[in-house]
Amino acid sequence: MRNFEMLPTEENVFSTFCNNVLGRNEDVKYFYEMLMSYDFSASIAIDGRWGSGKTFFVHHVMLLIDAMNSNSNLDSEKRDKIISKVRMDDSIKTELTSMCVVYYDAWKNDNDNEPILSLIYEIASQLCISINSDWIDGKKKFCNLAGTILECLSKKNINNMIECLKSENPFEEIKKQRSIENRISEFFKMIPEERANKVVIFIDELDRCKPIFTIRLLEQIKHYINDDRVMFVFSVNIDELQHTIKKYYGNGFDACRYLDRFFFQRISLPPTNKTEFYEYMGLGSRYYVDIVTRRICDIYNMQYREMTRYCSQVRTAVYKITHSDVSRCIFPVEKGHILVINIIVPLLIALRNMDTSKYNNFVNGKDYEPLMTLFSDEDNCLEIFRYFLNDKDSSEEKEDKIKITKDEMLMKVYNAIFNNDKEYKSDVMIGGCEFDNKTKEFAIRCSNMMTSSADYSI
């Protein structure tokens, strides 16, 4: 079974950017230009729901920054391909100096007592790797200074503050401890201007960290790092981050204003271009199951991670049937199964993923609202609506025909599948489809990917 949910590996970041899978390349370009425009140490928060693709967005920005910096370690072929995917102004293309980047996964370092330690370590290690090898002496001094800072900030030296107060010259010792800020300032100044005129530090997953870690990291960054050449970009879910802050300070605490101390600007993560995404997932066709799947993604406002998981499950569950000649059936019971596979199964998978209580009510015959919502879009439901009609039925006023509304028809189909034992207690013919007391079980098994319809090789 293929996992469509990609990790932000170097290869995946490069391929998704070059193919513009999420449709955000233009947003990446504008964000890059925004970063270039700042002439002070700004902190920007990119706000997005969990699973919306924030990590991929910041990695795409980092990729473009590296491509635009001629002193980065990107090979020329990759650099040219990346730049060709965005329409850069000529004035920006010709700049000789640019930005260098650091990526810090806060959640991976969540167990650190002093967040600034792991942050300084990541800055030192990543910048030493990303800057070209001819700056050998500078690298050594840079890393040595980073080591000195880490030593000064370590728990051992912090505990030594107590010993300092007991020494013969306590003020001199405290003065040495407070030189950390100067050393950190020197640390960033050692990045030669011909290599990069700015350092952009991307901090990801902060909203998933323990409250104490989150607070300490924000406070320590503000306290220790104040250099006009250093910028911070936080990719977070602001709502979740505010909840984290309130867990530390209390529910009555104004977490929104507190975060304003650290974030100069807040930006909402641009939405994905779903058309590009559906093409990538193989859902861009006019097969009815693809239309239904796209519609369901829109109805439940699925984020990138939710869509990849959902679409992968639908493909595995039904594509062997829906995208082959097997779907051309002549017997009513077969037509009923094909209808279930194309419509009911994708809906069951979505409900189970998104809302367990709605799923339970739906399969237990208590709530047909999800089916009604699915067909509230008139354009996409006309064809299937006709499929349900008997010879004597019509969706319009016609002589010798019985008019039946869409809602009435959908209710009949829903009851035939999920309330068959209560409403009918026998086989039911609706249009060209036949449903019986085993249709519900068939639908649930298909949605669980545990029938012959499933294809685990997809």
Name each region found by the language model.
Residues 43-47, 103, 202:
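Short hydrophobic/aromatic beta-strand immediately N-terminal to the Walker A/P-loop
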Residues 1-20, 24-28, 64, 171-174, ...:
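The catalytic "switch" region of P-loop NTPases
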Residues 1-91, 432-458:
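Walker A/P-loop-proximal flanking segment of P-loop NTPase domains
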Residues 52-190, 424-427:
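P-loop NTPase nucleotide-binding core
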Residues 83, 135-155, 264-341:
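Conserved AAA+ ATPase small/helical "lid" subdomain
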Residues 316-400:
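Alpha-helical lid/collar subdomain of P-loop NTPases
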Residues 378-458:
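Charge-biased C-terminal accessory regions appended to nucleic-acid-, cytoskeletal NTPase
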Residues 47, 51, 204-215, 222:
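Catalytic acidic motif of RecA-like/P-loop NTPases
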